[in-house]
Amino acid sequence: MTAEIKTGEKMIVFMVNGKEYAISVTQVKSIEKWQKPTRVPGVEPYICGVINLRGVVTPVIDLRKRLNLPEYEITDETRIIIIAYRDIEVGWIVDEANDVITVHESEIESAPEGVQKDTDVSIEQIVKQENRLLNIIDANAVLDKESSQSAVPDQA
């Protein structure tokens, strides 16, 4: 279930496959330029590998694959959004991330039934702002224990 959005909450807007998504800034640690992940064998297909981010081994998820969307080309606009998830950081590859908005309660609506029905990541809320419709995505809906930790070597 998507975390409750509060009036005045700031959200990062990012693009995946031509659609705008938003995530609370409270879930985002940083936004990084593209760097090619090192492959890790035996992980879920949507886990691209790991990157060394300021000395921290960080698993990277291809958000397009996680949302069952078509392949894409890496461009100068491609970004990795670093998400703080439980006690680790996880990167999401997105087409671009270039906007921060402030959301008000009156702009938030429940998503119509069946939104993102072809994936196990549900979109439960939508922000209607000016001429934009933004799917609110919650890190917990994308990252589960298995996917986020299966790319990280045992720390024991």
Curated annotation (Swiss-Prot):
CheW-like domain location, by residue? 8-148
Q: Give the PROSITE patterns listed for this entry.
A: CHEW (PS50851)
Which Gene Ontology CC terms are recorded? Answer: cytosol
A biological process from GO: signal transduction
Q: What is the documented disruption phenotype for this protein?
A: Chemotaxis is substantially impaired, with a 30-fold reduction in the efficiency of chemotaxis with aspartate and 11-fold reduction with 2-deoxyglucose. Inactivation of cheW appears to have a subtle effect on chemotactic behavior in the absence of chemoeffectors: the bacteria display a smooth swimming bias, with some tumbling. A double mutant lacking both CheV and CheW has a strong tumble bias, does not respond to addition of attractant, shows essentially no accumulation in capillary assays, and has greatly reduced methyl turnover on the methyl-accepting chemotaxis proteins (MCPs).
Record keywords: Chemotaxis, Cytoplasm
Quote the subcellular location field of this record: Cytoplasm
Indicate whether Cytoplasm appears among the record's keywords.
yes
Return any one Pfam family short name: CheW
Q: Which domain of life is it from?
A: Bacteria
Q: What does this gene product do?
A: Involved in the transmission of sensory signals from the chemoreceptors to the flagellar motors. CheV and CheW are involved in the coupling of the methyl-accepting chemoreceptors to the central two-component kinase CheA; they are both necessary for efficient chemotaxis.
**What protein does this entry describe?**
Chemotaxis protein CheW
What phylogenetic lineage does the species belong to? Bacteria, Bacillati, Bacillota, Bacilli, Bacillales
